[in-house]
Amino acid sequence: MALKSFNPTTPSQRQLVIVSRAGLYKGKPVKTLTEGLSSKGGRNNLGRITVRFQGGGHKRTYRLVDFKRRKFDVEGTVERLEYDPNRTAFIALVNYADGEQAYILAPQRLAVGDKVIASEKAVDVKPGNAMPLQFIPVGSIIHNVEMKPGKGGQIARSAGTYAQLVGRDQGMAILRLNSGEQRLVHGSCLASIGAVSNPDHGNINDGKAGRSRWRGKRPHVRGVVMNPVDHPHGGGEGRTSGGRHPVTPWGKPTKGKRTRSNKSTDKFIMRSRHQRKK
């Protein structure tokens, strides 16, 4: 999909750059593959804000996307590509040979009419096909990678993202991720071939604040412009730098502070994403 810019009839139109959706289906999603989605506005069940700067936005219908790809050895045909408001990537509606339908993440270069298949054995290395990592050729570009067999894809699901299979070692696959991290994943975990669709997502320009509001994003207020009652960086006469190392509103270090605490899975990370920055 190409990028689309507009004639500068207003200041926001001048700056607006969006992804063209010319090749996407214009109708409604398949009703049996959707669910209702209520807007939480960043609140929990007590009505308290747990995520700041969220609220409003357009009403959405949730599309049930198949991240597990457990329909083995049944060929499917891509009926159409669709926009999904709940994610940055596009999705594809697949009609399987037995009559079932499912949404999958659409990879790049997947077109209407293409055949896709998921299997526990080796299948063709072409976009949209899914198979265990132990059967995928080394060097392949993959997405929607499982971290535990049968759990469903968790790695490389955003627009334009991918992982690369760089090797194998004692039943484990070695993956290089977009972040630069190299990690081990069990060879029986499924992965889909190709990179995720909509790689131009990173080049869009909203053009105006209202477009963020349509997505349910409210203004993100800095701590240094608040009062002391609201934030540790607040207060002071005139503009200040905060006067201390960056902290959250609750006084915890932030901006570069390491937050990873799951030491039991450290052994699967061969090269940290932070290493290249040293």
Swiss-Prot record:
Entry annotated with the keyword Hydrolase: no
Molecular function, one GO term: structural constituent of ribosome
Biased composition (Basic residues): 210-221
Keywords attached to this entry: Ribonucleoprotein, Ribosomal protein, RNA-binding, rRNA-binding
Domain of life assignment: Bacteria
GO BP: any one term: cytoplasmic translation
Gene3D superfamilies (alphabetical): 2.30.30.30, Nucleic acid-binding proteins (2.40.50.140), Ribosomal protein L2, domain 3 (4.10.950.10)
Listed Pfam families: Ribosomal_L2, Ribosomal_L2_C
Binding partners and assembly: Part of the 50S ribosomal subunit. Forms a bridge to the 30S subunit in the 70S ribosome.
Function in brief: One of the primary rRNA binding proteins. Required for association of the 30S and 50S subunits to form the 70S ribosome, for tRNA binding and peptide bond formation. It has been suggested to have peptidyltransferase activity; this is somewhat controversial. Makes several contacts with the 16S rRNA in the 70S ribosome.
Protein name (database record): Large ribosomal subunit protein uL2
Lineage, opening ranks: Bacteria, Pseudomonadati, Pseudomonadota, Alphaproteobacteria, Hyphomicrobiales
